[in-house]
Amino acid sequence: MSKLLSGLSVVALSLSLALGAAGSAAAQTKLLNVSYDQTRELYKDFNEAFAKKWKADTGEDVTIQQSHGGSGKQARSVIDGLEADVVTLALQSDIDAIVQNSGKINKDWRGRLPHNSSPYTSTIVFLVRKGNPKGIHNWGDLVKGDVQIVTPNPKTSGGARWNYLAAWAWANEEFKGDKDKIKAYVGELYKRAPVLDTGARGSTVTFAQRQIGDVLLAWENEAYLAGEEF
């Protein structure tokens, strides 16, 4: 497993009904956090800790419910009417889409919380089969021989877009900005993807449980989860 691109921001913010909105907490005992695929385990623990802290500080009980899926798909669900109280998505553009198409979030959302409303970061890694039989160590190895790649669909998954951008960044450096070579590399990479799941968790299942592909492109925490679960 090789780290390839660090410092990827994950953006989070409160919608108009969230606990951070003045006067809303007293009337609300349930919150819905609409998040992307890989945060299930994170927020399961975080929500429990938050509920205890909120109870200690205010005397009120709060229940936090979760909705998970590809980041872009989740943004579309909120735009189409899913009543989220908080969204924690993988891309700034997904939150900006909610701003532009629903009016549920203020345009200046990035300035509302510290670190441009990006509370944590992650990185993209390669997860390979035991013993690394295809000898995959870097981006160039992904387009050698008969290597098959598992990655989500960048049209619906935030993590998939980071995978795409990481591949593009590597190719840009490798080919010294030659756009034709960069496009050819990225195109060849995606030709080697036998399936494009809508979200990163689906890709993890495809690789680890269904045993499809030689390498999984994933968030670092998702790679660790695959090792523990499968």
Question: Predicted segments — roles?
Answer:
Residues 137-138, 160-164, 227-229:
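A short secondary-structure junction signal
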Residues 3, 7-20:
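Bacterial N-terminal signal peptides
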Residues 21-27:
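Sec/Tat signal peptide C-region and signal peptidase I cleavage site
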Residues 175-230:
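Ligand-binding pocket segment of bilobal, Venus flytrap-like solute-binding proteins
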Residues 28-156:
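N-terminal segment of the mature folded domain
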Residues 39-45, 154-183:
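Bilobed "Venus flytrap"/periplasmic-binding protein-like clamshell domains
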Residues 13, 151, 166:
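Active-site regions of metal-assisted phosphoester/phosphodiester hydrolases
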